[in-house]
Amino acid sequence: MRTQVIEGSIAALRRLYVFPDVAAKLETLLRDRARAGAYNRITSAKALADQLTNDLQSVSHDKHMRMRHSAKPVPDDPPLNAPPSDANKADMRRMARQLNAGFVKVERLDGNIGYLRLDYFLHGDDVGPRAAAAMTLLATTDALILDLRQNHGGDPATVALIVSYLYDAYAEVHINDIYDRPTDSTRQFWTLSALPGPRYADKPVYVLTSGQTFSGGEECAYDLQTLKRATLIGEVTGGGANAGGPVKVGTHFSLFVPTGRAVNPVTKTNWEGVGVKPDIATTAAQAFDTAYLQALRAQRKRITAQDAPHLSREIDQALRTLSRTP
């Protein structure tokens, strides 16, 4: 079992890992550790997976790279660039519906501030209608708090969809690139000119981040920050920018191998290993109140009691409530 998993991992890394030079270092590490008997006393399959994950990350510093053990045999890898099987499509549809395509909460807060919590950027037919529904509810709010504190990633195309809603239809904004090693190609992501829901252009956006924000969640935050389209509030994010997928390396083992890397068109780099640094640093727990306070204060300057008495009272009450929050 150990030899199969180690050799399978080495072969997968050689063939697919986005950084070939690091793949060579990982091969040396695994062979040296195996020769030294580092894995001989491990009897639990899960413990072996955990140890291999720790060893691989100690050199790669790639948080996406993880070994997993499955009680059921791992299916064979599909051919490169093969479309998803019917079973995979059904699984993705089921997950999207169970998780509401990642849309956890959409709300109009007192003071006419919009709030959207997104925990995943899932792919599938359910995403577009839910995004349109969310943006329809938020359309008449005056500022948006986009909560990515528990966002663990997903499809970069869905990130591009959400970012597109924050720009006018005529805007042609280059959001992100992803280089893919197996095909030696780069895929570009731009804002979309046609969307099914109302846009949220030219209004303030505040993005909440935490140390748990990862992968696609980080991309969204990084994209909006580098484009100067949003103010980031919260904690430094997890630091995972290399895209990929699971590869079978043993009968019951799969290794997530990052095959691509994000290349931001503005910075020409990404957030791998360092995370996305917020514009306003605070704890994850305080991020919402901090953003809400900023949005309300901006509203207070813009809205007068004479022009909008009901909204003005809402703003004042919300500010008083926040001032009493410990």
Give names to the regions the model predicted.
Residues 124-142:
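A short, well-ordered alpha-helical element
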Residues 269-326:
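Low-complexity, Gly/Ser/Thr/Pro-rich intrinsically disordered linker/tail segments
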Residues 20-111, 305-326:
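Extended, small/polar residue-biased N-terminal targeting/export presequences
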Residues 116-117, 140-152, 208:
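Short acidic catalytic loops
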Residues 100-128, 266-267:
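STAS-typified acidic loop motif
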Residues 1-28:
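Mature N-terminal segment immediately following signal peptide/propeptide cleavage
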Residues 9, 56, 116, 146, ...:
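Terminal peptide-recognition signature
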Residues 153-204, 208, 212, 242-248, ...:
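Gly/Ser/Thr-rich loop/hinge elements
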